[in-house]
Amino acid sequence: MTIIPRNQRSEPRFCATIRSALVWPIALAAFVFATVGWAEDARKGTVPEKEVQAKLQYCKVCHGVSAQGFRGYYPIPRLAGQQPTYLENQLQAFIEHRRTNNVMFNVAHSLSPSMVAALAANFNALNPPPLGGAPRQLVATGEKIFQDGLPNQDIAACAACHGPDAAGAGLFPRLTGQLYPYVIDKLVNWGKERGQNPKIPDTSAIMSPVAHSLNKSQIEAVAAYVSTLK
């Protein structure tokens, strides 16, 4: 595997390489275009600000008053600063059972596309400090994996899709400041929660080989690194 220098990395180049290895690249492309179209349709409508604020307060009961996430027995993700397109896509994924979570299915299926777009925009505008709590001794190792990948395991750099600052772009989520235990839980259980509807191709397939190839200590290191970023 050839490692792309940091100053030459670009999302399209890396993702094209990953997608070319998938057995259904055309279906994946169709899904991406459909998702973008759904998001565009969502923005055409309007929702009264009072309703948006009421729904935001409902979301913050679990995700935190500043959407910073919740670090408990069941870690709940940080939504603050998240890419709007990604948030819209994930809510749609819950509705279509591409991603499994009974609580979020019940929340998402009651939302109109216009409300989803409004919520995503509001969460994107928030920027509270990270909650922290990750083992500091893992951060340096996590940074190296995130920025350079693991060539001996044929694992590309996380930064190639998520960006060198982990800010994400479009359908690729922002990982900056994401909760340490949440990142671990999602990567360890990736195949159990993502891509669950075979009739609807899902971009989660891009991450599947990466999540399955990382061992627990490597996952913990990457999670520690991104959780410290601001």
List where the protein language model places each region.
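N-terminal secretory signal peptides that target proteins for export/translocation
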Residues: 1-20
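Bacterial N-terminal signal peptides
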Residues: 21-34
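Electrostatic cytochrome c docking/interface patches
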Residues: 37-56, 68-73, 125-152
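Gly/Gly-Pro-rich "capping" loops immediately C-terminal to redox-active cysteine motifs
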Residues: 49-52, 66-96, 105-110, 159, ...
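The canonical Cys-X-X-Cys-His
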Residues: 57-65, 119, 155-165, 222
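Residue-level hotspots at or immediately adjacent to binding/recognition sites across diverse folds
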Residues: 65, 164, 200-204, 214, ...
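N-terminal alpha-helical segment
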Residues: 69-72, 100, 138, 154, ...
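C-terminal capping alpha-helices of c-type cytochrome domains
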Residues: 109-132, 141, 181, 209-230
